[in-house]
Amino acid sequence: MNIVITGASKGLGKAIAAAFAKDGQGHSFFFCARNAEELEATAADLQGRFPQNKVYTQTCDVSDKTALQQFVAWINNQVTKVDILVNNAGIYLPGSAYGEDDGTLEKMMEVNLYSAYHLTRMILPGMINNNPSTGSGGHIFNICSIASIIAYPNGGAYSISKFALYGFSKNLREEMKPHGIKVTHVLPGAAYTDSWSGSGIDPNRSMEAADVAHRVDAAAQLSPQACVG
């Protein structure tokens, strides 16, 4: 399969890629992230552990719509269709809705919502054109958060942006049913990743990124008739 993952250089994105890669089927991965060095290191690690896969990378600031267009053009130059899209890129800045800095909401929305919205719209035409009679036209995963459905103090703009991504995902799911394209929203709680390093958070009180990744991989393997959130 051809699999696109944003924010793939570390954390959940890296773990999800590894979960897909280890099945031995020989996938082609298209990764993007802002940090070129981390992205290349992740690609080399994945390629080394699972050599039957092909890994392609491109640096991309997903909050920049033009950069996303270039990313999709680069993908389309190499493959004719995308089977799985994982909208994983995201940022978290703590703060209250009334006390956070001006511009925080805009930045959160650009990365956590608009990137998924625009990239999905760019990828979908190819997925819709697949539309096989089997009803398996592709699968889109939106990595939301428990903050998408449960508010908490100092969630602020982050929680707002994840609520919005969840709403986008639910709406898109209904729109894609006639095209045989699955849309799954993933709502993990706190998962310990590199971004928590030095925070003082006890890793033993958080899920591992691999826990979330395994659920994504399992959902991707279900039959077209199966329904998961």
Which residue stretches match the model-derived regions?
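C-terminal helical subdomain
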Residues: 185-186, 201-229
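Residue(s) in the substrate-gating loop at a strand-loop-helix junction
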Residues: 145
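Active-site helix of classical SDR
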Residues: 120, 161
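The beta1-alpha1 cofactor-binding region of Rossmann-like NAD(H)/NADP(H)-dependent oxidoreductases
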Residues: 36-37, 59-70, 102
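Substrate-binding pocket helix/loop in short-chain dehydrogenase/reductase
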Residues: 96-97, 101-109
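Conserved glycine-rich Rossmann-like NAD(P)H-binding loop of the short-chain dehydrogenase/reductase
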Residues: 25-41
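Conserved glycine-rich cofactor-binding loop
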Residues: 9-10
